[in-house]
Amino acid sequence: MKQVEAIHTLRRWSLRDRVIFTHTDLRKIFARDKEPAFRAGLAALVRAGFLRRLTRGIYFYALTDKPVPHPLEQIAVALRRSCYNYLSLESALSEYGVISQVPLAGITVMTTGRAGLFDTPFGRIEFTHTQRTVANILDHTRDVGRPLPLASVKAALRDLRRVGRNTHLVAEEELAEVHPDDG
């Protein structure tokens, strides 16, 4: 992998608003390289600061000249690409204004994949496993024009109660006033 060619390739991807990559994505982008050359090239791009390792197996093209919208959500999608994921728990309830504190350090995501915590330079991503069916997830989330769908108020509250934490932060009166018919 020649560094100049790699930078040009990554720049072309960034023009299409793609700046967060998995290791597998990069391997496909640079498929012509033999494995040792790919590994060496990837390490050189990271060392030179052109790519930034965000967490294990996730990289960010650092030369982008555009702001990255919802980077934590993009990283979450990349980390659990083969799973159904949605913004829920404290993150969703905060967006709806029915929780008394705003989560500042990261996002809370429900996933059909494995639970886990990932610390990145953009903040923390907390995955909580759900056994909900895909149909149930689709019925209780909505597309809000971002990488992750958003749980309905009722679903986020149900998720919060199911995991058994921070229920004391929910302003029940606000929930009843603002979202009486949410489903």
Regions found by a protein language model. Give the residues of each.
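Short beta-edge/loop segments at beta->alpha junctions of small alpha/beta modules
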Residues: K2-R80
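Surface segments flanking catalytic/ligand-binding clefts of nucleic-acid enzymes
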Residues: M1-T9, A176-G183
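Nucleic-acid-binding surface
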Residues: A62-G183
